[in-house]
Amino acid sequence: MAKNKFHDGPGPSQRQLRVGEVIRRTLSEVLARGDIHDPELNRLSITVGEVRTSPDLKIATAYVLPLGGKGQEDVLQLLARNKSELRRAIGKKTGLKFTPDLRFQIDETFDRMDDTRRLFNQDAVRRDLED
């Protein structure tokens, strides 16, 4: 099999990024519109921050966060319970030959941003940045 000449770095390829973004957008739309036939899931507001795909595009990991940050484990259970219906909706809307298997994790980006902001607001760090 020929090696991809356009991607030598350790990060994801352009195709992985593009497919991940299409899946993220589709998941967000499906969850926002309430297209899933689960009243518990439809009453929640869920943010899909990022979707990362495996190099072979067989697995997609969606990083999600419920609005307000409360009930994270419940949201993961609800999404896992409705995974097949979400996967079917993604398959219809994306037109991919194979729809990736969905996995869900809590998005911790906002927590890391708060920690970083807190660090930058410390007096010692501010002095170092100003010098």
From Swiss-Prot:
This is Ribosome-binding factor A. One of its GO terms (cellular component) is cytosol. Belongs to the RbfA family. Keywords: Cytoplasm, Ribosome biogenesis. Its main location: cytoplasm. GO terms for biological process: maturation of SSU-rRNA. One of several proteins that assist in the late maturation steps of the functional core of the 30S ribosomal subunit. Associates with free 30S ribosomal subunits (but not with 30S subunits that are part of 70S ribosomes or polysomes). Required for efficient processing of 16S rRNA. May interact with the 5'-terminal helix region of 16S rRNA.
